Every structure is written in structure tokens, then in C-alpha cells.
């Protein structure tokens, strides 16, 4: 048995791993980009550096398939610009902060670092935490895409997709959006028999904690889930 004397120097403190994460909001609304960064920083480890950007051109919000198509060039340009930066500033992982996960396949082909979509991160987290989850999203036009992603990512775990039909920018700017979103979450849990809720819009990130308190079930925000998953993946990547 080893004996440590008083003269033995203490073991060095564990150095925090600096992880650089870049969140790309594919729409052009800067207030939403700032809210995404705030949500990510609240979830991140102290050794994680969070940056969030949005393209200068493209849709102001992403609420249908056409918006998703139009946002991809600007999204990919932001990722390419960051990847071409100096080594000490280059992101260790990228997060596409739109629930449709637009451009995810193309972004992964363009860079070596991990690229996460907030829908994929949230749905995998919800599938692990529950016997089945409901998605509560923004506009009805996004419901087919959410179902498509759910079947691709977590087949059988998604029990329903529900739209509050509140525009994305209103969710971002109006705290009063919380009440109808919370009521829809309650309806979804009852109707689907689910035991968790996935928030299907990055603008809903600030509602995750109060919804958990109100509903008493896991409420998964994709920004938070992607932050924590990216932190775990970076040390495992090449």
C-alpha cells in the first residue's frame, strides 16, 4: 500500500479540454442566432467555446421546404469559411441549428469534424430517455419533414408530430408563445401516450426548462442536446 507523505506534491489538476463548437443558424435573423448561442452556452461544459453565426443572405425564418432549400447555400458557406480558418480558431464540431437539419449530409461531406443537426441530436436523446416521444414544432408545413426525419433517425420512437402554427419569429420574440406551446405539449402527451417531448424549433430552446417543470417529463431541446452530444463526440473523433 502506497503512503503519501506530507512532502509529496499534489497531483496536478485535470486540465479542462477546450472544445470549440460553431452553431450555424441557417436563417438570417440575428436575434435568433443570439438566443441559440445563449442556450448552447447554458448547456455547455466550462471548457467549451461556443460561437453562433448566421448567413447574411437567405430566408429570415425557415418554415417550409422551400425555405430549407434556400438556406442551404448560406449555411454551407458559413461552415466552409469557419473550416478554412486558422487552426487555433477552427471549430472542433459544427451544429446546424434548424430542426429540419437542412444541408446536413452536404456539410458532413465538406468537413472532417463532426457535424450535428439539432433534430437528430434531440430525437436520439429522446429515444434514449423515453419509451416514445412527441414532437411539437412550429408551422404545419414542417410536420412532414419532422416525420421524415423521425422515421430516419429513430424509427418507431416518435409517436406523433404536432404543430402550434406560431411563426418562428413570433416564437423567438414573444414570451407569450410559451402558453400555447405548453398546452400543445400537454395535448400531445395525452394523445400519443408518449413520455417525452422534443421541441421542433430552435426558437423554442428557452422554453425547455420551464416546460420540464410544468410537464414533469423529459423535454428535449435540440440546441441543448446537440451541445452535449458534440462535447462527447469531439474527443472520439479523428
Regions inferred by a protein language model and the residue ranges of each:
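N-terminal beta1-alpha1 ligand-phosphate binding loop
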Residues: 19-44
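Periplasmic-binding protein-like
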Residues: 23-24, 88-98, 193-201
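N-terminal beta-loop-helix "entrance" segment that forms/cooperates
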Residues: 52-77, 169-174
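Glycine/small-residue-rich loop that forms an oxyanion/phosphate-binding "nest" at active or ligand-binding sites
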Residues: 72-131, 135
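Short hydrophobic/aromatic-enriched beta-strand-loop microsegments
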Residues: 113-120, 156-162, 216-224
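Active-site rim beta-loop-alpha module in soluble metabolic enzymes
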Residues: 141-200
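Short, flexible loop segments at boundaries between secondary-structure elements
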Residues: 220-237
Amino acid at each position: 500500500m502506497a503512503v503519501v507523505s506530507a512532502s509529496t506534491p499534489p497531483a496536478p489538476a485535470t486540465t479542462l479540454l477546450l472544445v470549440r463548437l460553431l452553431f450555424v443558424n441557417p436563417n438570417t435573423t440575428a436575434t435568433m442566432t443570439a438566443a441559440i448561442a445563449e442556450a448552447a452556452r447554458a448547456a455547455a461544459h466550462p471548457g467549451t467555446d461556443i460561437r453562433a453565426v448566421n448567413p447574411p443572405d437567405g430566408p429570415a425564418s425557415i418554415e417550409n421546404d422551400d425555405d430549407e432549400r434556400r438556406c442551404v447555400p448560406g449555411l454551407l458557406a458559413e461552415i466552409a469559411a469557419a473550416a478554412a480558418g486558422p487552426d487555433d480558431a477552427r471549430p472542433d464540431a459544427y451544429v446546424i441549428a434548424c430542426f429540419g437539419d437542412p444541408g446536413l449530409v452536404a456539410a458532413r461531406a465538406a468537413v472532417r469534424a463532426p457535424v450535428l443537426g439539432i433534430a437528430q441530436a434531440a430525437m436520439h436523446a429522446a429515444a434514449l430517455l423515453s419509451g416514445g416521444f412527441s414532437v411539437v414544432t412550429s408551422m404545419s408545413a414542417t410536420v412532414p419533414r419532422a416525420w421524415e426525419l423521425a422515421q430516419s433517425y429513430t424509427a418507431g420512437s416518435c409517436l406523433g408530430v404536432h404543430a402550434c402554427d406560431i411563426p418562428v419569429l413570433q416564437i423567438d420574440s414573444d414570451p407569450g408563445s410559451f402558453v400555447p406551446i405548453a398546452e400543445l405539449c400537454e395535448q400531445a402527451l395525452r394523445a400519443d401516450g408518449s413520455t417525452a417531448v422534443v421541441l421542433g424549433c430552435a426558437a423554442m430552446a428557452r422554453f425547455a426548462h420551464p416546460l420540464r417543470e410544468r410537464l414533469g417529463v423529459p423535454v428535449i431541446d435540440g440546441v441543448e442536446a446537440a451541445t452535449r452530444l458534440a462535447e462527447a463526440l469531439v474527443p472520439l473523433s479523428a
